[in-house]
Amino acid sequence: MNEPRGSEVWIGGLLCEPVNPQACAGVVFFNNVGVLNMCGHGTIGLAVTLAHLGRIQPGEHILETPVGDVRIRLHDANRVTVINVPSYRYRAAVPVDVPGYGQFVGDIAWGGNWFYLVEDHDEQLELANSERLTEVSWAIRMALEEQGITG
């Protein structure tokens, strides 16, 4: 999970016995930053892993996460549908002043974790610009924390 080969995008899942007797498993997701309440791609990978281990068969299942039950449908060994916990916009048009970049306006949303979603910016969304996008994203994240803007 940690450098030199790991990064924040690597996700681990700690399998636990579920409290809900209808759940096939409990899971706590984490990365090199800390615990994640929910992870969509981690859920897909976990469903495929549970099938590989023989713990689930194709069909609908419940996966217990710290934020609630997530429904998964295993179609076959490599295809999964995830029905996440309910998502919502908590606050709209929230400004944040980011040193060196100016002001951004975004929505705070919940989808298993908290997100700050920015639509209007001057950055090019392309792979060649990934380093700059990462810098700007981290600057926004730090400014949100410093200014106490949270979900």
List the model feature ranges, each with a label:
Residues 1-107, 119-151:
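A glycine-rich beta-to-alpha transition motif near the start of alpha/beta enzyme domains, typified by
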Residues 112:
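Glycine-rich ThDP/TPP pyrophosphate-binding loop and its adjacent helix/strand module
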